[in-house]
Amino acid sequence: MEGMALYLVAALLIGFPGSSHGALYTLITPGVLRTDTEEQILVEAHGDSAPKQPVISIHDFPRRQKILFQIRVDMNPAGGMLVTPTIKIPAKELNKESRQNQYVVVKVSGLPLELEKVVLLSSQSGFVFIQTDKGIYTPGSLVRYRVFSMDYNMHRMDKTVIVEFQTPEGVVVSSNPINPSSVLIRHYNLSELVSFGTWKAVAKYEHSPEESYTAYFDVREYVLPSFEVRLQPSDKFLYIDGNKNFHVSITARYLYGKKVEGVAFVLFGVKIDDAKKSIPDSLTRIPIIDGDGEAILKRDILRSRFQNLNELVGHTLYASVTVMTESGSDMVVTEQSGIHIVTSPYQIYFTKPPKYFKPGMPYELTVYVTNPDGSPAANVPVVSEAIHSEGTTLSDGTAKLILNTPLNTQSLPITVRTNHRDLPRERQATKSMTATAYQTQGGSGNYLHVAITSTEIKAGDNLPVSFNVRGNANSLNQIKYFTYLILTKGKIFKVGRQPRGEGQNLVTMNLRITPDLIPAFRFVAYYQVGNNEIVADSVWVDVKDTCMGMLVVKGASSRDNRIQKPGAAMKIKLEGDPGARVGLVAVDKAVYVLNDKYKISQAKIWDTIEKSDFGCTAGGGQDNLGVFEDAGLALTTSTNLNTKQRSVATCPQPTNRRRRSSVLLLDSKASKAAQFQEQNLHKCCEDGMHENPMGYTCEKRAKYTQEGDACKAAFLECCRYIKGIRDENQRESELFLARSDFEDEFFEEDNIISRSDFPDSWLWLTEDLNEPPNSQGISSKTLSFYLKDSITTWEVLAVSIAPTKGICVAEPYEITVMKDFFIDLRVPYSVVKNEQVEIRAVLYNYADEDIYVRVELLYNPAFCSASAEGQRYRVQVPVRALSSWAVPFVIVPLEQGLHDVEVKASVRGELASDGVRKKLKVVPEGERKNIVTVIELDPSVKGVGGTQEQTVVANKLDDKVPETEIETKFSVLGDPVAQIIENSIDGSKLSHLIITPSGSGEQNMITMTPSVIATYYLDATGQWENLGVDRRTEAVKQIMKGYAQQMVYKKADHSYASFVNRASSSWLTAYVVKVFAMAAKMVKDINHEIICGGVKWLILNRQQSDGVFKENAPVILGGMMGGTQGAEPEVSLTAFILVALLESRSVCNEHINILDNSINKATDYLLKKYEKLQRPYTTALTAYALAAAERLNDDRVLMAASTGRDRWEEHARTHNIEGTSYALLALLKMKKFAEAGPVVKWLIDQKYYGGTYGQTQATVMVFQALAEYEIQIPTHKDLNLNISINLPEREVPLRYSINYGNALVARTAETKLNEDFTVSASGDGKATMTILTVYNAQLREDANVCNKFHLNVSVENAQLNSKQAKGAKDTLRLKICTRYLGEVDSTMTIIDVSMLTGFLPDTEDLTRLSKGVDRYISKFEIDNNMVQKGTVVIYLDKVSHSEVECLNFKIHKHFEVGFIQPGPVKVYSYYNLDEQCTKFYHPDKGTGLLNKICHGNICRCAEQSCSLLNQQKKIDLPLRIQKACAPNVDYVYKAKLLRIEEKDGNDIYVMDVLEVIKGGTDRNPQAKARQYVSQRKCQEALNLNLNNDYLIWGLSSDLWPMKNDISYLITKNTWIERWPNEDECQDEEFQNLCDDFAQLSNTLTIFGCPT
């Protein structure tokens, strides 16, 4: 009777019908609720006027075990029976580790009917932004950043933020918590060994890391330019049908505002997909005059490159422009890309078009017309077809069309086209869509249309909002008011009502636009008809992006707004909201020339914030519920009107001078060609008279003609004719040198203070506006500072965050800094040690008079230059008014590191002067190479005794450049052991498990079990959204029904059988206990006495003294027992019942005193049997029972019973799944997460979704095991590694501790050594150690292995006239000769020529080689990027295998680079890339280079006069003693010249030290050979002869310590006199000299130098 009574009660509860009331109760919430955020919701009682006090409560989902928030409100007629309580869901109460969506239940009680809505939850509670001080950095520099944080009300928020820095490869190298209230500014140090590319700074809230904000910045080597270049195409597109040439205007301005004089090189091309196809014939040199120039792409040049222009439609044109200053000192490369090649010049888009229309009511459509590059197209007429409407686009490219829709139609096709009068109809742009009719509720025909017709809306406006209704008269008469909600940033901002008078079909209200509604809002309105129908509409409204508050940066006075001097004092004034915190930074505008993509702006702020809108359309909806859903709202009513359950917070995304000889030559060519009247022969003659770059004879050239014998004859005749004329012509060149000398009229350089502080950014400050506000409510603050030394324009950017008005980015304030006379010292980012380079000091004179300037390069021993110690190098130059002059200085860096280059200049007769000191980075010679070694640290597998110790052997670096550093970087990254498997079983496929229980005591449990386990799994994995969150209520009802029905089969002693009159079953009773215990975790109404009664019966009636459980009455339906039936039955049954007891422990431990004892007895029994078990199934089941009882922590027996360590197999598939599931549970209980991974994968691969009869145990266990895996894996912290790196140079090892929380943050360290070291790891988990070794390898030109090709490359000077030189500073002729080494000719061969820096190829030569009758090449392409070395790619149809074939063309130098690095030339087969050969070429190194003396890779400057002291007259003994005893003289020797050697362009004099007269640094040199190194040019001046003796001494600075001895340099400071031999000393001519030498030797040897 008791069981039947419970069943009836449960049935009544489950089947209680919904009550019918005369009112409509409504609950509306945001479609997504945010944690820790105040949210407004709406509760309304329509048709009920009785005061009420509803209780709004928030519960966890799915189990509803916690009340997260609760509030009671007053609902009364005075408030319109409408309340808008504010709720707040605390994040601390939720599962932070869950990887699934989380939901809450919003419940309203205290009304005649309860309202309940399951709402998606978001843990993101605000916005966080990062600002870096600039958008581009160099290796080793400092990235400054600041963090701004605010909530969804735009209030400043001080929640902890995690900031991560990620490399371009996505590796997190830094992760730090920041509290924005205490630390607004932080920095991150980039190492020298840093990845180039785009980095990320990612900010996210500590408790909601799934939402983040990312700031980007680039890392690369760069030097700031001194000017910027802007390109402006004549059109934003190339119209394919047009005939106009394409023009690009070039504007170049110095960053301090003055115009640039110079030259531009322009190359056009077409980008097809991702490949750039250059147009070589378009390469032109364009003068930049007064800052402007224009490039033109002619249509015929485009057609010559691409015959079928229609094939280019859909691709883009680009223009690559390189602008160089007149002095050649600076260069900026820019590109105008994205110029679309089109058939129609416009594109049409629909801007958030409403998907649905209301028949018979206006339909508003906003169209957006763009140019092909995506920019807005203004003043373009547009027209809609079918339903006619027309308009013209505004400046922002938009036009609003209003379509009057017809009645009684369910579909509305819409086509809009441009209506430009200059375009034919087929070239007009069109766009089509189809809108669907709004479906009224129950076909009532009631409509609401909300109209907002204003175009540009801004804060402060009064916006008219119209409510337009249509429907039957009876329905309209019931409308007393409209309820409206205003949503912004995903929150309900305001709720109100607009009254409606009787008979009004159109009602209008004014809405005040406040700053809170920026950047956009949604206006949702609805009315009720009766107590059942809701009619709704909504509209999305864009508001002009401005600050909610205000922030202005300006000069504090008119003086501060003028052009400033470097280093001057000035003031700026900040004006903004009271209490605002302002972050400042001043950035050199040159930074934005390199990269302006990442600068923070107000628009970027609002773009991010606007993404918080949970609405997904521009307004409207498919029906009344669709209106709420699409606006981002959740609704439920007392009449079961429910919006669909939302499962994602985001919206789906919808699917850029001429010589006379030249004239004569032209006349000769014309007259000769005129002799051939036929057009084809005329061209053959002309081509024969073209100069041949390769220098081939006329006869050899004729072999390449392919146009027949007549053409070849004409070609040969004309070629020989013109050769005779050319042989008579001569070329000449001029060189002009000027000098002026007025030394006394210049300002002394020692009194000039050099400018040296040139930061990219500075003024990185944070200021609080705490001053009392003025009458307009504005606070202000004045800041004083000194400007830096740069001549530029500084852009001061200010970003504020106010207490209640969010973030405001002020308009940048510019500070221009310059002088009438100054130096711009242009130095590269880095130079290579011992390689010559030219730097330029550009003198700018912005005065109205010409000036004369003296320039001095200051001496630095780290460089070899014309400036030497004690010897100034000065140059005097004239500089015209309003112009510049470049003074070149050639230097050779001799030492690695950062070294000062300093130049000073003064103006003759004036006080005007300037000085600049900059750091020049000198890097080692050779090619930078990387060696990467990866070590896996896994001490549990690879260790001994829990510790893995490994020796890392140093790399063999045989090709390292001597005396250069090795840099080794270690990076250790943890590896979370567990394999996270998202949605391991798709919850949407479990629908079949929620069924209605029925049948006998066994059948009922069989049919109840699926609902229990499905609910258990979906609760644990958070996948109800896949099945439908409403299905959980249904599942709980089915569980309760099965629970109630099972009571029928419960006996008085709490045991169970299939039928009441049948003997009680141990297994069935245990199973009921287990299932009910699981259900009790999900359903509150299961009585613990029911569970514990079964437990007590099992212990008292079925457990034996040895702990084993017996079965006296097996179940009828044996299939429901799964694998427990079969061999080893006693162990299986005992283990199964033990599992049930353990499941019930949390419920029954307080009620059954003997429970623990029973569990211990059973575990003791199982432990005795465990290692002897034969069945994999029984082993797995027993292992789980023992592990759950905390009596087993060793998985060896369990894993030994497995197959492949991932499954426990028997004869039946379901038994395999069941047994493997037990094994997985056992591994999880034992915390063997690494071993659990493969098991989980095997179970998932089975794609088993369960069933009922015959599958009960497999179903229960697989979902219980996978649910447990989902629960434990995110929360387990089984990663605790201690890593120690023992480096030879460190006394203390590097130690790192890695755990689950910091696993993905790389730990890095660097060392300069390349030696063996050891790394040891202990603890749990895995980690990866990456060792990056970077060194400089020697460049070996002769090491290039050539395969199948012979290649020779050479250069020679080309003497040209000014026209041929095309304005170039110099011209070389490049000769490339190759032969294929195979048995037949090589077809389709490519020659890749890298240009020398500063050089461009002669396109006329290349064109002649490819287009003449005598074609030598198939085609060529130019990649002209002069930031790096440009490239010419030459295509050959074949390369001969029998003879050498040569190509010859000119290359022009357009700017100086001093030391020119070799350029590679590579020839390779198109079809076989392994067949290739590379050679290098460079100009004559013996010309114009500074002299230096080198041993190995160590060089000394030798740019001084040769030693001429031995030629001095009137030298006596006192003078010799005085000079030899000078403080800086290191040694005095008598030495014999043994031999003279030549090495690296220097002379090496090998001398035998006969006598040490004055000892120095070199220890024991007597009777030993020593090397004296001298420049080759000093050989004649020294005139040293073999076997002669010499008196020689030198300075300590001229000693060169080598590995085992010392070498000596012969410089201008070296004293050398020939010491006559003994026979000569007897001659009267030499007697006095010999006596002086002997006395000098005795004096210095015996007495030393006088003090």
Swiss-Prot record:
Expressed by the venom gland. Residues 1197-1259 are annotated as: Factor H binding site. Disulfide bonds join C547-C808, C616-C651, C684-C711, C685-C718, C698-C719, C864-C1501, C1346-C1477, C1377-C1446, C1494-C1499, C1506-C1578, C1525-C1649, C1625-C1634. GO terms for biological process: complement activation; inflammatory response. Its main location: secreted. Glycans are attached at N189, N1282, N1352. Mg(2+) binds at P519, D542, V543, D545. Complement-activating protein in snake venom. It is a structural and functional analog of complement component C3b, the activated form of C3. It binds factor B (CFB), which is subsequently cleaved by factor D (CFD) to form the bimolecular complex AVF/Bb. AVF/Bb is a C3 convertase that cleaves complement component C3, but not C5 (as do CVF/Bb). This is A.superbus venom factor 2. It comes from Austrelaps superbus (Lowland copperhead snake).
